């Protein structure tokens, strides 16, 4: 948005980009709806840039993303996958998930995660609360050098808890078999997003056996 004039060593900023940078604010140039209509992948990119840079989207930009979120499905699965891989990289993976949800895009690209937002867990084991809170907490703990598949293992390891939730007579919450059902769900999600067979196998097997890892000594 800025034009640098070498002769006078000055920057001509006709769209207020310098001010937005100083205030850590994300804004499209011109009408947000028009910019997103030019390439619907920009809807996801707006979320990724906000997460990566720790910026806030200005109201009109965020409103346009929310209004147009459904159009992201017009973008190829491969392009969506590549953008999500960048979004869920540490150290901004947890904020990326939150912004994806708040923007309405989570419901479009990873709708299977939506039920985790309200899925309660036993406070004895999960004082952090819902399955969604558990997932975002784990994402926030990922090391920056984590392999690209690891955030996806975290995202999907408890994906089946909402559909397997039961409550005992004593009031305890259980999720019997969620790891096996979750592995099947994870495979379908990753295939839909056109992950490679090698990536799918690694993530799915980790989801399938993650309850055994907690007992390892």
Identify what each model region corresponds to.
Residues 1-155, 159-177, 181-201, 209, ...:
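Glycine- and charge-enriched loop/helix tracts that form the active or gating conduit
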């Amino acid at each position: 948005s800025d034009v640098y004039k070498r002769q006078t060593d000055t920057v001509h900023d006709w769209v207020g980009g310098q001010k937005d940078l100083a205030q850590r604010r994300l804004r499209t140039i011109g009408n947000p709806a028009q910019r997103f209509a030019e390439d619907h992948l920009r809807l996801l990119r707006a979320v990724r840039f906000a997460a990566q840079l720790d910026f806030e989207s200005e109201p009109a930009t965020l409103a346009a993303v929310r209004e147009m979120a459904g159009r992201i499905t017009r973008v190829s699965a491969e392009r969506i996958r590549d953008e999500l891989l960048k979004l869920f990289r540490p150290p901004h993976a947890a904020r990326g998930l939150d912004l994806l949800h708040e923007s309405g895009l989570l419901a479009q690209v990873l709708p299977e995660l939506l039920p985790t937002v309200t899925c309660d867990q036993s406070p004895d084991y999960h004082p952090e609360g819902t399955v969604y809170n558990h997932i975002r907490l784990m994402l926030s703990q990922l090391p920056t050098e984590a392999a690209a598949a690891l955030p996806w293992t975290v995202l999907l390891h408890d994906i089946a808890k909402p559909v397997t939730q039961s409550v005992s007579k004593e009031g305890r919450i259980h999720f019997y078999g969620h790891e096996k059902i979750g592995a099947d769900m994870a495979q379908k999600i990753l295939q839909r997003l056109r992950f490679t067979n090698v990536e799918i196998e690694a993530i799915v097997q980790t989801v399938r056996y993650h309850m055994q890892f907690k007992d390892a000594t």
